């Protein structure tokens, strides 16, 4: 994996026996450009970009073994690393939270840019796929992102039956929580450092 810093962004390239990914994460555009080849995953990524205010350009996203699990997980790894490289967690608010309704679904997201990776959600999906994306991809993406961004993320589903609505409500709340966590702050961590 290679990382290249830009003025307002980071390029991450990841090439394994399973996938080839090249992405740019920036603080400017606030939208998704390009495609992962998985339509519903693109929809979730674009939702995250819109609500977080971050820009994501997908230059390359190819599966060498045809297994979507690998592609989605490795995309999360690449995006998480780009996020960690782009931001100094000691110079931002660090904590963020948001709860977002979407029709019958209501999901909250709670974020800490702590340097300590942890992911938890209190819901499971009731179907195997949402559109063209295996539902396990949601958790695989989030775990890849969280572990390499080195952040803590909790999702709490208050209500919801439709898996499309639940996942989109979750991603909207994640984007908003990240945007709030990235707000500037003079308040320092009590420990004095974030590893």
Curated annotation (Swiss-Prot):
Source lineage: Bacteria, Thermotogati, Thermotogota, Thermotogae, Thermotogales
Any one Gene Ontology cellular component term annotated for this protein: cytoplasm
Catalytic activity, as annotated: D-erythro-1-(imidazol-4-yl)glycerol 3-phosphate = 3-(imidazol-4-yl)-2-oxopropyl phosphate + H2O
Catalytic class of the enzyme: lyase
Keyword entries, A-Z: Amino-acid biosynthesis, Cytoplasm, Histidine biosynthesis, Lyase
Keyword Transferase: no
Primary localization: cytoplasm
Native source organism of the sequence: Thermotoga petrophila (strain ATCC BAA-488 / DSM 13995 / JCM 10881 / RKU-1)
Listed name of the protein: Imidazoleglycerol-phosphate dehydratase
Cellular localization per UniProt: Cytoplasm
Coiled-coil zones: none
Statement: the UniProt record of this protein carries the keyword Cytoplasm: yes
